[in-house]
Amino acid sequence: MSINNLRNVAIIAHVDHGKTTLVDKLLQQSGTLDRKNMESERVMDSDDQEKERGITILAKNTSIEWKEHRINIVDTPGHADFGGEVERVLSMVDSVLLLVDAVDGPMPQTRFVTQKAFDQGLNPILVINKIDRPGARPDWVLDQVFDLFDRLGGNDDQLDFPVIYASALNGIAGLDEEDMADDMSPLMDLILEKVNPPEVNDEGPLQMQISALDYNSYVGVIGIGRITRGKIKPNEQVIVIDSGHSERKGKVLQVMGYNGLERVEVPEAQAGDIICITGIDKLNISDTLCNPEQIEALPPLSVDEPTVSMTFQVNNSPFAGREGKYISSRNLKERLEQELIHNVALRVEQGDSPDKFKVSGRGELHLSVLIENMRREDYELGVSKPEVIQKEVNGEIHEPYEQIVIDIEDQHQGSVMEEMGQRKADLKNMEPDGKGRIKLEFLAPSRGMIGFRSSFLTMTSGTGIMTSVFDHYGKAKDGELAKRQNGVLVSMAAVKTLAYSLFNLQERGRMFLGHGTDVYIGQIVGLHSRDNDLPVNPTKAKQLTNIRAAGTDENLILTPHIEHTLEQALEFVEDDELVEVTPASIRLRKK
């Protein structure tokens, strides 16, 4: 296939605006998917956690054959926490499809990824999706997107963008919202027409940059990237140059292209194509592969600095080793080193003792996805409260700030604004939609937002929507930020909890455990109704007497206890507390 028949595009969207569904429909209608995948939804999100959370974490590649052209499509994560993924992906493509919801319009994460695309000089194609939603307002959305591009400093070509309307769920698209085709073909035709073929030289010596890695126990490390010059064949000798400019020899075993979602071995790949290669050990992201006769490194890829850190430590609670398989500091260290290979935005440093590691990432979500993965792989660990990473600039302490958009019902506006004020947030904008809901935009220091999400859901009775995205590093705000108001109930005994004592403890606060659960000394068993910590005994049984009672036993009714998810537990703990994470349970304890 000649270069002129090749198109490389990335799909950008805010969380939940439907980009993974859109790719599904393109795959089905172009006839690229086989029968077994035809029925399943969101084929692209193949990771367990992606299916459960309904978000995309890892960037994926796929390709579609359409009218004798090949379109390589890369799906990117919308969360700013996975920004490390987004930047690498954009280095492989020539244009982006910006997907925006026809009701919500552009959201903060859309802005984050669009800024990255503009920095790379890519021209966008706007897809206004979910056009069939009640309350769709495509003209308003179009104006909003134009204003956004203008604010981000787009040039004339970027501001003169093509627009197409679609409903990915129904699998239809059209250049006019009133006149939709029966399928997605207008979108595919628009991509062929508006996206330039890759500007590369397929005659020169080989040059290719690795922009993503995968691992497979059968072939080892798999490098994914786009060939910028020349051709590559299996069993070819290459020189690998890493970001420190040191060179070593290597041999490529297999060369694989994409067909739909599957990787297929190809006899040769040429410049402009996105491919995977195997056979070279210890590949790193942003390594350059080149022909031994002409050694030239490509500029290294940049990734945003981490903003949040946590301490991972060996689980040293009395229950250590009961539920997990990997519990030693060596297991922990090896697992974190393995994660560093393909998780670019992660940093790991040795802590203040051999069994502690300081792990930094792009946000709470980024790190909690890693902890959840480790938990599923039978690891046990203790995790401290998330902290923001501060920097010193010209003798002043700077901290990360985030832009937050909150969508709530009018009646909750007062309590949310008061809480945000205590967390040192500045209100930037506010627009009521006239139907009983209001949209608030804040700029707030990240350390004030740790632990806000769970109280926000309680405040709005679960009806509020909140999205946040890293904005910049700015001068740190003075003064203490709002902390947890209540103390905790700490167990001072170690056996099974009993309903009799839990029933009597209910007057003191909300319990985190039910009847018949094993506890240990120092474990947090509930939330105190006052602001101090209280040692309690949840294992006390009723004293038996030898006098026969005539039905004087009271009927013990326990209020349902609070069960924390991993994210809620991380947000709940204070500086002197830990979250104990094991494959079977999540416990809170004092250090």
Annotate the PLM regions.
Residues V86-V100, G105-F149:
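Conserved P-loop NTPase nucleotide-binding/switch module
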Residues N123, R133-E193:
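Canonical P-loop GTPase G-domain recognition
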Residues M208, Y215-G220:
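A contiguous, basic/glycine-rich beta-loop/short-helix subdomain that forms a polymer-engagement track
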Residues D16, L22, G54, I73-D75, ...:
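Residue-level signature of catalytic and energy-coupling elements of molecular machines
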Residues P162, D189-E193, P197, G223-K591:
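Accessory interaction regions appended to the cores of large information-processing enzymes
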Residues R35, M107-P108, R133-D139, G171-D176, ...:
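Switch/connector loops and helix/strand junctions flanking conserved nucleotide-binding motifs
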Residues A10-I11, V127-G135, I172, D176-M180, ...:
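Conserved short loop/turn motifs at secondary-structure junctions
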